[in-house]
Amino acid sequence: MELIFLGTSAGVPTRSRNVTAILLDLQHPTRAGLWLFDCGEGTQHQLLHTAYHPGKLDKIFITHLHGDHVFGLPGLLCSRSMAGNVNPLTIFGPAGIREFTETALRLSGSWTDYPLEIVEVSEGVVFKDEQYTVTAGALNHPVECYGYRIEEHDKPGALDAAALIADGIKPGPLFQRLKHGDTVTLEDGRIVNGQDYLSAPQPGKKLVIFGDTAPCPAALALARNADVLVHEVTLEAAMEEKANSRGHSSTRQAAQLARDASVGKLLVTHISSRYDAQGCESLLKECRAVFPECELAQDFMQVCV
């Protein structure tokens, strides 16, 4: 999986940062997929500066309905349609996302030429297929807001072809069945269990993307043991009280949560427009003082999960 930050500013865009949007390129060997998390104003403009096309999007996950997270959605949906795309698209989001989307399209005389499904989520599993499970967890913000935990299912172990050949089993169609862990009967009557020739399953990656939140127990539970956590850091530690009063977190609080949840890497975003480049360096230092495995996101930054 690879994350591409399209917008990393809080509330309003700046000259160097657009408002919130994050692409997730699944890069799964058996399943192509491009997911978008939040869609602030100007997201489709940001996409134009990448190698990705809106037509490749198949899922959009909205954390909450504040404008800096959704005002880019109607335009993106329309542009995707005007490009002639007919591939289905599913939008997941809190209560109200259906009304917001349908009202924006209706009042502007717009429509989509592709199947559009809108799913209003609550806590729990919101999507599951053979490769991934996505779970929503409620966060602490003035409006209904969610974080999303994306879990890649464990991948089967690798087949030890050399061991099979050493045991007198020739390469061929049977190898594919053995790779799936099946038990097969050879021409000489031997029974071979594929599980005996497979390495241990490869654990799937765990990625957690938060919407806006002040510290809360649910956030800690959702982030537990994630390989990568994306967390907002709207304000510096000295302004923690102000951040919390508005449903946001400070640098110190985001880093503490990452440490307490035993995550592998912390990516901080949703930076207040009050901070210039030097200020952002200070924010990162505050985070790393508590949790060293931290990076401060920039627009168009790409991170492998």
Swiss-Prot record:
Zn(2+) 1 binds at residues 64, 66, 141, 212. Its EC number is 3.1.-.-. Pfam families: Lactamase_B_2 (PF12706). Signal peptide: none annotated. GO terms for molecular function: 3'-tRNA processing endoribonuclease activity; exonuclease activity; zinc ion binding. Keywords: Endonuclease, Exonuclease, Hydrolase, Metal-binding, Nuclease, tRNA processing, Zinc. Coiled coil: none annotated. InterPro entries: Metallo-B-lactamas, RibonucZ/Hydroxyglut_hydro, RNase_Z/BN. The keyword Ribonucleoprotein does not apply. The active site is at residue 68. Binds 2 Zn(2+) ions. Its cofactor is Zn(2+). It comes from the Bacteria. Zn(2+) 2 binds at residues 68-69, 212, 270. NCBIfam families: PRK00055.1-1 (NF000800), PRK00055.1-3 (NF000801), RNase_Z (TIGR02651). HAMAP family: RNase_Z_BN (MF_01818). PANTHER family: ZINC PHOSPHODIESTERASE ELAC PROTEIN 1 (PTHR46018:SF2). Belongs to the RNase Z family. RNase BN subfamily. Homodimer. Zinc phosphodiesterase, which has both exoribonuclease and endoribonuclease activities. This is Ribonuclease BN. It comes from Enterobacter sp. (strain 638).
